[in-house]
Amino acid sequence: MTGLDFSTAAMSIAREIAQSAGVAVDYVESDVYDAVELLGRNMFDLVYTGVGALVWLPDVRRWAEVVAQLLRPGGRLFLREGHPVLWALDETRTDAIAFGYPYFEHPEPLRFDASDTYVETGAVFGCVESREWNHGVGEIITAVLDAGLQLTMFVEHDSVPWEALPGRMTETDGEWRLTEHGDRVPLSYTLQAVKP
């Protein structure tokens, strides 16, 4: 098993978790766009991309090309990600479901300043600048198909594994759903594709 991330801190925590679980994992600290150069082509049976990964990437087409190059023939992409509709919602609004950010991909990132982070920690930071890109469902699926992968599944979900809209969600079995009108907004999706 191989794990790849650009964050030294994330890699350190991942190593601790793997060690405590008794799992052997090779960790590579790198920008995802350099993964093929570091890991080689046609090396993996499975590439897993987790929730929240794509928002850090400016170019989803390039990401899909990297995934396709990493996979062996017959290899599978498994992507569980926050839905672009969720990323476009204004999380500060508590009176209504309202859009506050673009749904479609833009060349320039959205910039956020905050004193918190997505990592569960009690630490308070002075200021954290976050740069994020949203990618619409059509852009993501087209990128995967254009990279030569065959789509085998796409399912939208009414839940996410964190409280994405604070004060407006209820947690059940490790997943958070809107307390009201949960049937109106997709919050995440699962996509699977195979390399022929």
Q: Model segments located where?
A:
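A short glycine-rich, Lys/Arg-flanked "PGG" loop and its adjoining helix->strand segment in the class I
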Residues: 61-76
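Conserved SAM/SAH-binding beta-strand->alpha-helix loop
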Residues: 7-9
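Conserved SAM-binding strand-loop segment of SAM-dependent methyltransferases
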Residues: 20-35
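A short SAM/SAH-binding and catalytic strip from SAM-dependent methyltransferases
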Residues: 45-61
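Short alpha-helix
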Residues: 130-154
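Conserved SAM-binding loop
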Residues: 14-15
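Conserved class I S-adenosyl-L-methionine
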Residues: 76-118
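A short acidic, Gly/Pro-enriched loop at the edge of an enzyme's catalytic core
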Residues: 33, 37-47
